[in-house]
């Protein structure tokens, strides 16, 4: 396909989803089954309104059954499923349309997702796309019966280990996904939707207490310092604001945010997307709070020249202001998080520093209610 978007000054090629691949393979299989012919390409309409002309491969014909594949192209998106082959096996049924997952397609084991527990992880929009192409082909050939469709993915079980599926409780393979049929490179929307899906799963287990960490540093610190497992919460990446929004929308009452100062300090400036491309402000935020705590002009100048928050904390330590400044920042973080949540949830924060130290030796600061919330989360973990 030749669809492009411009992002961060670069022209990036779009791709197509596993859902589009599945629908295309099904359409090709149905055409070859009903038309008693062989085709090497097929056109499918996507929900986004873009028509795709996709190549068909691995054609295997039997008397009443056709199997074929479509290779996914994720464009310029760094997608682990790029290049995967999605297969469809199509055969006739008397009336209904049955869509099932075969080898390499995940199986849902936890509630809260768009597919029911026990079902193949083929999401509603791809299922609808499959039904629409079958209806189209049936009308073309005057066919009044039904179809059995089995979708599979080459090496799907191995590839799935690199996706969010294990954390979502989807086992044995990848998911057939896509709401638009098109992959936009580095799509923030796709990342946020993944976080939402993970929250949906976790709140079916517990929506009273919730752990949020931006990434692996926070996850490891939470586990090794406090015994808190991210299974009781989510990794939110840079999307702290969107995560808080969705947690509050789902009536989560108590949220504990644990992360490194380099990311969390930005929240003290009201920055809710902490990616450096969106905003930085680390030096400015630390410098402002250092000034409030009585730092010298030389100290503030040194902070403004620093490259990392760990370097800043060394400067503050030498000035005798490390604790005061970090606590001041922490209170402002809590203020902005409460404001974002419209004061509808109790939010506590743990912020740690010194990435070069061993986990057990890292300095950390916490808001007044964080210790009690950690205890409650530990109790919930014991129940689970």
Curated annotation (Swiss-Prot):
It is an enzyme of class 2 (transferase). It catalyses: Co-precorrin-5B + S-adenosyl-L-methionine = Co-precorrin-6A + S-adenosyl-L-homocysteine. Pathway: Cofactor biosynthesis; adenosylcobalamin biosynthesis; cob(II)yrinate a,c-diamide from sirohydrochlorin (anaerobic route): step 6/10. It comes from the Bacteria. GO terms for molecular function: cobalt-precorrin-5B C1-methyltransferase activity. Keywords: Cobalamin biosynthesis, Methyltransferase, S-adenosyl-L-methionine, Transferase. GO terms for biological process: anaerobic cobalamin biosynthetic process; methylation. Its EC number is 2.1.1.195. The keyword Ligase does not apply. Belongs to the CbiD family. This is Cobalt-precorrin-5B C(1)-methyltransferase. The lineage of its organism: Bacteria, Bacillati, Bacillota, Clostridia, Eubacteriales.
